[in-house]
Amino acid sequence: MTTQLPNSFRSGPDERGHFGIFGGRFVAETLMPLILDLEKAYAGAKADPSFQREMDGYLKDYVGRPSPLYFAERLTDHLGGAKIYFKREELNHTGSHKVNNVLGQIMVARRMGKKRIIAETGAGQHGVATATLCARFGLECIVFMGAVDVERQQPNVIRMQMLGAKVVPVQSGARTLKDAMNEALRDWVTNVSDTFYCIGTAAGPHPYPMMVRDFQSIIGTETKTQMQAAEGRLPDSLVACIGGGSNALGLFHPFLDDPTVEIFGVEAAGHGLTQLHAASIAGGRPGVLHGNRTYLLMDDDGQIQEGHSISAGLDYPGIGPEHSWLHETGRVTYLSATDDEALAAFQLLSRLEGIIPALEPAHAIAKVLELAPQRPKDHLMVINLSGRGDKDIPQVAEILRGQK
């Protein structure tokens, strides 16, 4: 499908929250006043210089920004092609990019007078970031997490509990991220007066996809400045993994109107695109889920299918609506990596660079192993290393033991 190209790829969404045919706000009547209040509060925060000053202070002194742009010399030499840089989001406080967005949303929640924060989490990184900021600001925190993810991400469950959050295992459906999001939305509907729903990815009803993207765009903004300092020019290509896609949009968005920059998103191909996977663009079609229209994994009857990935953060059966639009306009190329490819990349990076990545960005690294050797040595490639792999070590160790 082709979409008429806009004057700018950075101008969306429109006033109703649409990116082309994608996005919007498909929510229960009970929630609509809340969504409109949030939109108004966020617009007010954006227009308030003191809000940005306060946020910048926390990003610097609490989160630890700017995160480094690191030249991966040994990986570059090993692949023999493009010069590879990592945007080191795994060095942020809490261990991933998630904290950038959570800080912004919690500051908006405080502005709205909300005292109770709910969140969904898959890999647990968003849950940890939310629990962390709630502890910092003295707010009640409830995190919904699929029971399957609770089992495979125990280190993060313990972290959330130590930070004072209540972790609610979700037993419905496939007991993963989609089901956790369903439960969070149900809670929100019944607790509208005092509760703020802190969504972890660039999905959900408007203004969430825009708001999450805006808070994450610091990744790409810093990368532009850092690459100019390191190489005197823009990168030639960007690569990031995609679940809902907030880490990718954070890196991509500031570069969307730079036509010389190639952009690649990497979905989770699971066991392969003809089997169990979570690649919504490669194997899905447009539909409505969790308040927005986007590409979804659906059966012939339009029922949502379960996503599968070795990575708990990528098995969502949809993708952020802006990604769907960027796919249809052709501005971003979407690829996919299997569980086995991600696992191999996880091990390779650990041994070559002394950096243990999360399984989520290991999917992006897996595609870099193919893309980089095809490009000349003066090609500058930036990968968003969106999280660290501490949370995945027990799971990976168990898989590797089983392979012996």
UniProtKB/Swiss-Prot annotation:
Function: The beta subunit is responsible for the synthesis of L-tryptophan from indole and L-serine.
Residues annotated with N6-(pyridoxal phosphate)lysine modification: 98
Biochemical pathway: Amino-acid biosynthesis; L-tryptophan biosynthesis; L-tryptophan from chorismate: step 5/5
Catalytic activity: (1S,2R)-1-C-(indol-3-yl)glycerol 3-phosphate + L-serine = D-glyceraldehyde 3-phosphate + L-tryptophan + H2O
Cofactor: pyridoxal 5'-phosphate
Protein name as catalogued: Tryptophan synthase beta chain
EC number: 4.2.1.20
Keywords carried by this UniProt record: Amino-acid biosynthesis, Aromatic amino acid biosynthesis, Lyase, Pyridoxal phosphate, Tryptophan biosynthesis
Species name: Rhodopseudomonas palustris (strain BisB18)
Pfam family, one: PALP
SUPFAM superfamilies listed in its UniProt record: Tryptophan synthase beta subunit-like PLP-dependent enzymes (SSF53686)
